[in-house]
């Protein structure tokens, strides 16, 4: 089949809260981007059909190839989302949507592929020096959950992405304050993972824990109705509530610890890349936050980490971009 006949391609980036859809009408050219709330649809197929109906006027040909990046492990045909109610069979969904091929990959596999094609203005560097070209790149990002993956560029230029579930590693507190936060979380959950703190709901959890700290019982606090990640972040940046600023500082410190742990584990001298929608919302603050200092506070490995650049991904739809690149690789090489 001529390459032009494989377009348009149906792309999706499905997280715990939102599902983003787009149509790739030519290489790296994505149109008709829509964001739908997962909770508004009973199933993935329902959401896709609704999306396609909205794009009907601009859809000259029905897509026959699709690539969906989903925020959950892919371990066969049956897929169960980690942070929302959707479950689906890949093959049944393919048939339902009358696709010739439906590729389903982990969302952070897509993020890794997207990073391979990013330009300098798509990224904001936070410290470090320069990436080593063929060294591993660590990709992680807080959102509804916490994703982690690895990108390796081989000497021949080919790419290898290693998916993982590093967001669910056990959280390791760094100091007495983080021990207090961990203890609060431990009273609520059997397993306290990094994702419990490094996510949207994690900001709320950190805030709740800090509000119980001795000496902070009587400080001005948000009402229960105001206790959302967005309001906590806004109040922290505006200086409205000191406890909100402490919450955001603690969040960034914890992220620095985890990013350093991942970088050390992988030897990620190709750089660390922070994806997801949370960090770009306060990028100016993040540049001077405790993140980088904590990232480099690893005793004998401090000098090793000091040279590793950390990049915040600023591009709006990297999940869709990566889903498209993964599908292109599959169609060309029969593998991703």
From Swiss-Prot:
The gene is glk. ATP binds at residues 12-17. Keywords: ATP-binding, Cytoplasm, Glycolysis, Kinase, Nucleotide-binding, Transferase. InterPro entries: ATPase_NBD (IPR043129), Bacterial_glucokinase (IPR050201), Glucokinase (IPR003836). This is Glucokinase. It is an enzyme of class 2 (transferase). NCBIfam families: glk, PRK00292.1-3. It catalyses: D-glucose + ATP = D-glucose 6-phosphate + ADP + H(+).
């Amino acid at each position: 089949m001529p390459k032009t006949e494989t377009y348009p391609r149906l792309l999706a980036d499905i997280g715990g809260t939102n599902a983003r859809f787009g149509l790739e009408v030519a290489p790296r050219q994505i149109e008709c981007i829509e964001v739908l709330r997962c909770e508004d649809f009973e199933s993935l197929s329902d959401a896709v059909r609704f999306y396609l109906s909205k794009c009907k006027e601009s859809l000259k040909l029905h897509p026959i190839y699709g690539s969906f990046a989903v925020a959950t492990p892919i371990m066969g045909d049956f897929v169960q989302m980690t942070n929302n109610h959707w479950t689906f069979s890949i093959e049944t969904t393919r048939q339902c949507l009358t696709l010739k091929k439906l590729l389903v990959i982990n969302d952070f596999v897509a993020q890794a592929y997207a990073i391979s094609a990013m330009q300098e203005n798509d990224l904001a560097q936070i410290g470090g020096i320069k990436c080593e070209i063929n060294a591993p790149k660590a990709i992680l990002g807080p959102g509804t959950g916490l994703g982690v993956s690895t990108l390796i560029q081989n000497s021949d230029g080919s790419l290898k992405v290693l998916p993982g579930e590093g967001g669910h590693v056990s959280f390791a507190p760094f100091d007495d304050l983080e021990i207090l936060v961990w203890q609060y979380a431990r009273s609520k959950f059997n397993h306290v993972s990094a994702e419990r703190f490094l996510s949207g709901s994690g900001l709320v959890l950190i805030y709740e824990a800090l509000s119980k700290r001795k000496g902070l019982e009587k400080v001005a606090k948000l009402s229960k109705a105001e206790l959302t990640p967005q309001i906590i972040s806004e109040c922290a940046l505006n200086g409205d509530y000191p406890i909100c600023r402490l919450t955001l500082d603690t969040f960034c410190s914890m992220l620095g610890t985890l990013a350093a742990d991942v970088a050390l584990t992988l030897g990620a001298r190709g750089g660390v890349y922070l994806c997801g929608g949370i960090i770009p919302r306060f990028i100016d603050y993040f540049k001077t936050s405790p993140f980088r200092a904590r990232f480099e506070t690893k005793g004998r490995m401090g000098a090793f980490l000091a040279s590793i650049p950390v990049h915040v991904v600023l591009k709006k739809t990297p999940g869709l971009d990566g889903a498209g690149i993964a599908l292109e690789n599959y169609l060309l090489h029969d593998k991703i």
